[in-house]
Amino acid sequence: MLDATTFDELRIGLATADDIRRWSYGEVKKPETINYRTLKPEKDGLFGEQIFGPSRDWECSCGKYKRVRFKGIVCERCGVEVTKSSVRRERMGHIELAAPVTHIWYFKGVPSRLGYLLDMAPKDLEKVIYFAAYMVIDVDEEGRHADMPGLENELRLESKTLSDQRDARVAERLQRLETDLAALEEEGAKADQKRRVKDTAEKEMGQLRKSFDEDIARLERVWESFRTLKVGDLKPEDADFNELLDRFGLYFEAFMGAEAIKRRLQAFDLNQEAELLREQIATGKGQKKIRAIKRLRVVSSFLATGNSPAAMVLDVVPVIPPELRPMVQLDGGRFATSDLNDLYRRVINRNNRLRRLLDLGAPEIIVNNEKRMLQEAVDALFDNGRRGRPVTGTGNRALKSLSDMLKGKQGRFRQNLLGKRVDYSGRSVIIVGPQLKLHQCGLPKQMALELFKPFVIKRLIDLSHAQNIKAAKRMVERSRPQVWDVLEEIIRERPVLLNRAPTLHRLGIQAFEPQLVEGKAIQLHPLVCAAFNADFDGDQMAVHLPLSVEAQAEARILMLASNNILKPSDGRPVTLPSQDMIIGLHHLTTVREGAEGEGRAFASVSEAIMAKDQGSLHLNATIKIRLDNYVPSDAADTGTEPVTAVVETTLGRALFNEALPVDYPYVEAVADKGQISAIVNALAERYPKVEVAAALDRIKDAGFYWGTRSGVTVSLSDILTPPNKPQIVAGYEKKAAKINSEFEKGLTTDLERRQELVKIWTEATNEVAEAMSANFPADNTINRMVTSGARGNWLQVRNIAGMRGLVNNPKGEIIPRPIISSYREGLSVAEYFIATHGARKGLADTALRTADSGYLTRRLVDVSQDVIIREDDCGTTKGLDLPIATVDAEGVLTRDPNVENSVFARTLAADAVGTDGTVVAKAGEDVGDVLIDKLVAAGVVDIKVRSVLTCESAVGVCAACYGRSLATGKLVDIGEAVGIIAAQSIGEPGTQLTMRTFHTGGSASADDITQGLPRVQELFEARTPKGASPIAEAAGRIVIEETDKSRKVILTPDNGDEPHVYPVLKRSTLLVEDRQQVELGQQLIVGTVDPKEVLRVKGVREVQKHLVGGVQGVYRSQGVPIHDKHIEVIVRQMLRKVTVVDHGDTDLLPGELVDRSRYNEINRGALQEGKKTASARQEVMGITKASLATESWLSAASFQETTRVLTQAAMEGKSDPLIGLKENVIIGKLIPAGTGLSRYRNVSVEATEEAKAERYPNRIFADDSAFSENDLSFVDFDSFSSDDYTPGTYN
């Protein structure tokens, strides 16, 4: 088999008949599969052992040769080669077709490649291929030209003869009529009798004339048709054509079916056609030019690859190996088989029948019908259902063809190549493990034993607990006590990976050191739950084992939970204490007025603890304590030395501060969610990861400990309804009644009434909510939960204890009658009914949103998967100017609110100069929190920073333009797959975005504004929004023209160009006034603008701003922080292609989409050779289109439209350079990112002397007990084999 590591490119091409015969090990001649009595494969059948190899290892079919010693012998009795049965997975066969057939992908795909090549409409092609019309293949021009006069004379003569004959026959009939009439006259017949005879005669003469005229006309038609006959003409099978064939069959050839296409293709001159097309493109206009460009693309791809176009017509069909289309016996003796076998059988049956008919010399019409059926059978095999009704099996189910095997989520690409199942893995339910350290997880003993089984077996043999593998296996299965000891020893320091599906971002897989636990559930550290989005209501997680030493090192260094404290999307900590921990710390750090022991002073924390244990001091009483390592809370940096001081605080706060690092400033505040979040933020910024993890564990332990002791419970008596609620509601009921009566009198419209009522009841709800929260005492548990941020919010409490308020109906409008009851009081039936509407819609919405968001993530990953950090610095001087400060009302500079997610963690592109002209920061410096504060203090308003949008790396991006990795807080490493991180960061919060299209004011009068997830999709797909606003094409003056039906905005440019007219709907809101001066690109009406227009009018930078700003707007509105750089990575991919407008003297085709880097490279080459360069226009592509336009055909095929991508790639003979990640996953190579980059793969390590000394300690002076059987910790077991080692001796 192919070894994935030995090749650098993968090419796909068109297989010729010779290629297929070369792959094949024999021809499949019979449609039989296996003999149902002997269950042996039939000879020459679809499973034949002679062709595909033996079905049992080292055993021929008849049983003459058995055993491996006959390897390679071909049995002379049955003709089967003695070899391994696995060859049945790789050996192919073939079917020799009795008539050629076209490949359906090239004929029926959109656009039809065959149609483009032969310049025929697909409808006409279909007529020829399926035997409804003849196609002229060849015309003997010279012969026809030479014989034309003679033939014409002959024809004229014949036509003259015919007309003479006609006249003679008519005259003869007339003569007879006269004779008849004379005879009747003599007999004295009546007038009507005469008339009858006359009519009959006239009718006969008419028929005579008609039949002769038809013959003459046919001659004319045939002659005309022969005179204008050219290659490629279609002729229906009728009398005219038969006549043409009889008379002039020597001068031309016409065929039906794939035979016709094949002959045309064989005679096709690609070079000449390419010349013609280039000429057409140069001179043509409009549709003609577009079609010529498309055709040239097909023609030039055949020229470039050297493929023969005739390979699109098949003479041989390959048969895939039988193990890939298996046939298995079910329990009842029936057989289950792959659909492919049925499809192959139809092909073989029809092929054999056609052969027999040809041998018998059957009439043409029968043979053609059989040929058509063969064509249809091969079509169904390749792509069932592409043309006509699909072939169905039992139960009217369409059979799965070869194309269906590749397509879609269940196809080969996505199911087996990108999503393999892996060994050394297990899954189980998770439970919380509060006793664990941040880098640990609890692994059930049984599960660990199963996972580490091979390692345990090896160690048991090494320690001579067992003599051989079988014995060791038996020991493991019987769980002997020694096994557990060995397992403990092995598991030490070996990380395992835990994963929770759905893995929405890279923190969904993290490494932990396993601790063996009893029971069957995996124990998870509470702080990593947020990253996994896990809870303990029955979630399951999977465990995977990194096997190789490199994998273990990577898991430990890169994936250990304690090294993944920051979120890659915004650089903020993800391991924030939550719920119980917060309530515990809140309980610990509150101050209680007048509590036991207030005002006392203590010499140390220990003394205060003793007082508390004696019961003379309350945890929350204000006291004075002498603290040894005190850093004042206003200390700016970590540099401040700790001092000894007497501090006024509470015992609880002193205990809380003991959980923080020694030199951390003393926290003198209530530890609610915000405070803890700020502390963890500061820890992550200032301390090394080891210390942060330790501090987090201490905070967690303190939180759980005091959370338990706080005794926080919820009972019905804690839910306090405000006593004045009835009075508040009654007051507003009066107001509402007044408005209703005004409406009944006809003073207001229904709309006004609704709006007023909504306003009134919103006020009422707010007033009840305020009364309710004022009514809660400070020590009420619900109040403590909400104010500390542990769980819930005031809205939920209002629903339970205040009033439910207004709700929406399914249309999204607000029902003007509120729900006055709270859940504590209970809802009436009517109230309950209207409340269910909104709630149910919410659930349905969430389900849809999850699917939508998942699909968005998939597209984002696909478009950005090959964006990898490839170099340190691309050397560009370009960058983006971004604001870092805003001027507030008093004229003071403050930090811009969006600084965190725009300039933070980037690299300066130019020196930042303060107001006094001094350089505050040099170009190339990293912009962190400290530097931002320094810049703002120096009066800098905006700075120029590097960005991936302006990066000039040819492949991937450079580290300097990307800036700091948000997950580590350091400059990004080379090999970091920033594209995938960007896709995950944008996709992961996708489920939190709303799905709604907001109706402004509850009525559909104004244009709906798309927001939430649909808006993000619209931006990333670069779609033209519904009701897009026009933008000013030039700077100029506006005139607004209104008629009673329509409204126009007319823009007169300042530079004297033609005025631009924009028709505008009457109901849309204008953003410009009459006679106003506008800038280039200014928006004219309220609504969203089309990114393609922005690009055309204002250029690349503006469209980048528009896309990044638009996506950020949606996420900010939902309070989801994402750094701009992630969105920029995606936008960079959307803008990387240009469309060639004029190809100059280069090899580019006009209208071709090329990568900007490749386009620049080609132009540079042309300049150096002094040729005319190409010109192009920038494109903005949606992410789906951009993914399909990738250089890698493997990646594109595994994304969407598999058959179309493969058809195109095979025709162009595309080579996949295997640069991206997906392609390498598919073929099973290490991905070229992270440690898979060649610069990391080829590193050689030199051990230092200290390391050697540590690894191989000098044992000469050790006491002899060091050589006892069990302590072999200094033996390097990885490189040790048990053959040259006997326990008890060490050589």
From Swiss-Prot:
It comes from the Bacteria. Zn(2+) 2 binds at residues 874, 951, 958, 961. Signal peptide: none annotated. GO terms for molecular function: DNA binding; DNA-directed RNA polymerase activity; magnesium ion binding; zinc ion binding. GO terms for biological process: DNA-templated transcription. The keyword Zinc applies. Its cofactor is Mg(2+); Zn(2+). Its EC number is 2.7.7.6. Binds 1 Mg(2+) ion per subunit. Binds 2 Zn(2+) ions per subunit. It catalyses: RNA(n) + a ribonucleoside 5'-triphosphate = RNA(n+1) + diphosphate. Mg(2+) binds at residues 535, 537, 539. Keywords: DNA-directed RNA polymerase, Magnesium, Metal-binding, Nucleotidyltransferase, Transcription, Transferase, Zinc. Zn(2+) 1 binds at residues 60, 62, 75, 78. GO terms for cellular component: DNA-directed RNA polymerase complex. Transmembrane segments: none annotated. It holds the Pfam family RNA_pol_Rpb1_5. DNA-dependent RNA polymerase catalyzes the transcription of DNA into RNA using the four ribonucleoside triphosphates as substrates. PANTHER family: DNA-DIRECTED RNA POLYMERASE (PTHR19376), DNA-DIRECTED RNA POLYMERASE SUBUNIT BETA (PTHR19376:SF54). The RNAP catalytic core consists of 2 alpha, 1 beta, 1 beta' and 1 omega subunit. When a sigma factor is associated with the core the holoenzyme is formed, which can initiate transcription. This is DNA-directed RNA polymerase subunit beta'. It comes from Leifsonia xyli subsp. xyli (strain CTCB07). The lineage of its organism: Bacteria, Bacillati, Actinomycetota, Actinomycetes, Micrococcales. The gene is rpoC.
